[in-house]
Amino acid sequence: MRFADRVALVTGASRGVGKALALRLAAEGCDVVVAAKTVAPDAKLPGTIHETAREIEALGRRALAAQLDVRDDAAVERVVAEALARWGRIDFLVNNAAALYWRPVADTDMKRFDLVMSVNVRGAFACTRSVLPSMIAHQFGHILMLSPPVDPRGGSGKVAYAISKFGMTLIAQGVADEVREHNVAANALWPATLIESQATIRWGMGDRTLWRKPDIVADAMVGIFAKEPRVFTGQTLIDEDFLRAEGTTDFARYRCDPDHEPPRVGFGFKLQAG
């Protein structure tokens, strides 16, 4: 186990990519703060923080199921304080919680715009700000944003979402410079292809021939967190490219449909009209 007795906080960890990342960190030896809004089962939207926590405990690690809406500053501070009171440190923060809304500017309701901004960029900022004092005190930490390289051509059809996600990347780059001397890293990671999740299913983003499993994001995350923080920081990474550089050659194992290699779309995927 690469991260024995480290502590990780993963937002949006009740399902999908966030859950996969939380479980992978547990498998690598971490105790995990499972932070998300969902506490009760919902037939339309599977997964709760308690279900993820139980699966982590089944792996032999400790879990803290923490109900968290990242838009609530007091709740963010409370969850971080509870984790520190229980385990004394937070070594890894994964800013995965997200609001997904893809519409042209003319069709974007301002309430939706505010939601996307408050969850994605403001929520990531709040969580990052809250964990930094502990990471600096311990002279160790990795912060990971699930956000893409900034591309001014990538926002068509999803401008509000693009602004919020690019904002997360800019947070990572700024924080990297601010805390490098304290052996704390901040990086951004984005998938080369669509990833199977409730988001891709509910928003009709093609079918399983176009998707990879969340495992590829988890493998890239583990590789990033294994780096020396003060050395490997301020990076904007694509999962496949990072893993290839690290020596991975078998990407077929990440396919959702074993007979189809998903195309690389990066941040440029567009929903079909209608």
Task: Go through each PLM region and give its residues.
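Short-chain dehydrogenase/reductase
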Residues: 2-87, 101
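Active-site loop of short-chain dehydrogenase/reductase
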Residues: 6, 61-62, 89-90, 135-149, ...
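A short helix-coil junction within the Rossmann-fold of NAD(P)-dependent oxidoreductases
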Residues: 28, 86-87, 103-104, 130-142, ...
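Substrate-binding pocket helix/loop in short-chain dehydrogenase/reductase
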Residues: 104-105, 112-114
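A short, exposed helix-loop element centered on a Lys and neighboring polar residues
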Residues: 128-129, 173
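Catalytic loop of short-chain dehydrogenase/reductase
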Residues: 142-181, 190-195
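C-terminal helical subdomain
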Residues: 181, 188-189, 205-274
